[in-house]
Amino acid sequence: VEFCLWDAMDDSSNFQRNFSTGEVEVVESAIYHKTEYRERRDHYAVFWANAPVTSFDTSRDAFCGVYGGPAAPEAVKAGHCSNSIAHGWAPVGAHHFHLTLAPGEKKSIIFGLGYIENPVGEKFSAPGIINKARAEAMMARYATDAQVDAARRALADYWQELLSGWQLTSGEEKLDRMVSLWNQYQCMVTFNMSRSASYYESGIGRGMGFRDSCQDLLGFVHMIPSRARERILDIAATQFEDGSAYHQYQPLTKNCLLYTSDAADDK
């Protein structure tokens, strides 16, 4: 995995600074990405496995090679990682395991990627040592095959409940699957993400559009009505008495862009 540096705008612009901030910590089979945690953040990421590693890398250059890439990483060609500790540059998480299997034998390794937030007063377990209690609890929840299988079943049950409110039986299997599964799934993704991560919006610029968000509700409202209601109230809060509205707003802060729209389809 390759870790972001927590600031999408800065990640894509201030390269000289970004190459100086990356910070990681390795504890057994867990790689903690803690860039700027000491200075200003209350969150970190962790990439872990439930088995002892043979070697690891946390530097992208060390894993891929200075002129290499993910298609043919230097560590894969060499047959081992170099136990690199990233100080700046591009922090990553890579595990290497050496396994010997008898004929017909099976072994499993569980990998997890998690995000942890700590209250400001609980950031450190000792001076300069990040508080790993929540990360350790997360790893303990998914430490065995049985626990992971149970979590996957719970996830499947969650989606089954969401999708079961609208099902098509047409006699055409592919049409049924498109309408009953993928159309609903895409409607939920669109509701959550709006136009982010597209050619139109990278995720940090325009926010959520007034008109688009109203339209997105139509395909989602039957799935989680309470969230649809919350979105309607958020959208309504950007509208004025004369019927005009802020053209877009940011979903995390609920703040609006600094201009109103005169577009007819925003009224």
Language-model-detected regions and their locations in the chain:
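Beta-strand-rich interaction surfaces with strong enrichment in secreted/lumenal proteins
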Residues: 84, 96-100
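Single conserved hydrophobic/aromatic residue that forms the stacking wall/gate
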Residues: 259-267
